[in-house]
């Protein structure tokens, strides 16, 4: 009986597998699946710009707007001539091609069918893209590559597509501990992540900026009518927070998650550690770590991200293509080796306004990896 196979590079196979890479990213990606929205009025920490799906270009321009500041016109006072100029700021996120090639081996090694090789290739490519997107978005929001040893890009990495990392400004950076630390250089091993730091971030988010100040006011993401900030912490910061609170205190935080989140918030609160004062606490393995803090520049630390709306932007897509990602199969060495290439066009950037971060606080704390091994 003749064997039924799907020919390599067939249109049906390419469309199916390129679409599946995008679906996997949306379902399993940390930022993509939970904290991303598009449109003119995004309501999530990551704003996805869809312009690349409609037109070509090496950059996408986006706009940020501040609150109105002027006084109203009262009584019979003439209103004409008192119009207030909208306080908007535009910025560019540059985009570039991003591709990854995987070799499926040579014909001597191929004991599987072509369909099986596509399945394996798709799974590995999806895992890779999910990891790359998660690491990249976290680096941009953190404004640094950090010293994480398990990242795809090495520690000399400074960004993709001409979009450089932007370090946190002094208005949007806070430090752990009792409040004595005023910089990463003055952090000590005792300045760990705790609820006091979260309380400070909540208070600052509610009081800083807006109105007549030209400082962006952090806006809480709104999920089903409920405003909830997002705090993304590193696993070691989670460990320190649990130790600080003890079983009783931690039970109260997890109880708030169980009783305070409804089904419509499932993506936003899915896998959360808890809810504290309407802040959803999430842990992310790709949280940025450092090993050069403290007075001696040897203190290990981690940067948590306290996020509001439009903390960062992601431009993603391929104009004129049905799928976000491309999928190309090619035989090399006279039909001896099969290679599969997945690619897209993208750009990532932290949103800033006049040199100030727009929607994120950096919460820097000591975070000693040896504390979880001893």
Residue spans of the language-model regions?
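N-terminal, well-ordered alpha-helical segments
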Residues: 58-60, 64, 100, 123, ...
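Structural recognition of the beta-strand scaffold that forms the well-ordered cores
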Residues: 61-63, 103, 230-232
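Short active-site-adjacent helix-start/loop capping segments
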Residues: 69-73, 102-103, 111-112, 336
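N-terminal "assembly arms/tails" that initiate or stabilize quaternary assembly
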Residues: 1-95, 349-374
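Core alpha/beta structural scaffold of self-assembling particle/tube/pore-forming proteins
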Residues: 3-23, 27, 111-374
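Short acidic, glycine/tyrosine-flanked loop/strand segments centered on an H-E-D-like triad
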Residues: 84-113, 307-318
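Short, solvent-exposed loop/turn segments at the edges of secondary structure
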Residues: 57, 95-97, 226, 335
């Amino acid at each position: 009986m003749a064997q039924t196979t799907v020919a390599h590079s067939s249109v049906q196979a390419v469309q199916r597998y390129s679409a599946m890479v995008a679906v996997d990213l949306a379902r399993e990606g940390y930022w993509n699946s939970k904290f991303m929205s598009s449109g003119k009025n995004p309501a999530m920490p990551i704003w996805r710009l869809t312009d690349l799906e409609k037109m070509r270009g090496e950059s996408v321009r986006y706009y940020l707007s501040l609150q109105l500041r002027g006084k109203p016109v009262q009584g019979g006072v003439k209103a004409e001539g008192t119009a207030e100029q909208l306080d908007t700021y535009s910025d560019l996120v540059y985009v570039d091609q991003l591709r990854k090639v995987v070799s499926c081996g040579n014909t001597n090694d191929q004991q599987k069918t072509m369909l099986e090789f596509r399945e394996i290739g798709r799974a590995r490519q999806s895992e890779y893209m999910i990891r790359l997107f998660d690491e990249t978005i976290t680096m941009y929001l953190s404004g640094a590559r950090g010293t994480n040893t398990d990242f795809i890009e090495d520690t000399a990495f400074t960004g993709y597509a001409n979009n450089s990392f932007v370090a946190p400004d002094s208005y949007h950076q806070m430090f752990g501990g009792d409040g004595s630390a005023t910089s990463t250089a003055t952090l000590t091993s005792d300045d760990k992540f705790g609820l006091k730091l979260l309380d400070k971030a909540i208070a600052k988010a509610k009081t800083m900026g807006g109105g007549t100040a030209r400082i962006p006011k952090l806006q809480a993401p709104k999920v089903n009518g409920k405003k909830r900030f997002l705090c993304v912490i590193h696993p070691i910061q989670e460990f320190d927070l649990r130790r600080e609170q003890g079983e009783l205190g931690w039970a109260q935080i997890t109880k708030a998650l169980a009783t305070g989140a409804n089904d419509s918030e499932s993506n936003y609160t899915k896998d959360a550690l808890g809810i504290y004062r309407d802040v959803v606490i999430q842990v992310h393995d790709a949280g940025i770590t450092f090993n050069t803090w403290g007075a001696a520049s040897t203190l290990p630390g981690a940067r948590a991200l306290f996020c509001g709306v439009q903390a960062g932007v992601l431009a993603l897509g391929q104009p004129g293509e049905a799928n976000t990602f491309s999928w190309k199969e090619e035989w090399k060495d006279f039909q001896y080796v099969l290679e599969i290439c997945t690619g897209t066009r993208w750009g990532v950037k932290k949103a800033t306004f006049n040199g100030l971060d727009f929607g994120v606080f950096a919460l820097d704390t000591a975070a000693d990896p040896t504390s979880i091994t001893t």
